[in-house]
Amino acid sequence: MKFISPTIHGLIDYLVVVFLLTSPATFGFTGLLAGFTYVIGIIHLLLTICTEYKLGIFKFIPLTIHSGIELMMGVLLIVIAYTLFSNNSEGKLFYVIFGTVILLTWLFTDYKGIHHKKVETT
């Protein structure tokens, strides 16, 4: 069941940006782990503000493209956890969990808004 509406997904996206941009300070990340997390946060912010949904600002990336990017990023972040951060248990754990959360959000989002449109009565 796709129970996350496009609007709620937009809220989640902005919360993810805040989470990513505050994680290095909150969790004490340094070096590559901190830098990578900031870059991912900025990329996610750009994707979020450019997406064509209620909470987007510039609205030129279709929500279906946003969906595909999130699917790829979720998988890629888990792969990165085991490659780029293979010797950093903190980074590995962070990106396995974060990638999994991205994939679950992708899985449960109604990107077409089909289940969340108002039913018109005649």
Which residues does each PLM region occupy?
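Intrinsic N-terminal pre-sequences and regulatory tails
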Residues: 1-7, 11, 112-122
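Membrane-helix boundary elements
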Residues: 11-33
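Structural signature of hydrophobic alpha-helical transmembrane segments
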Residues: 34-44, 96
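Membrane-helix boundary/interface segments in integral membrane proteins
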Residues: 46-59
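Hydrophobic alpha-helical membrane segments
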Residues: 66-81
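Membrane-helix boundary connector in multi-pass membrane proteins
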Residues: 79-95
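Membrane-water interface at the C-terminal end of transmembrane alpha helices
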Residues: 81, 102-118
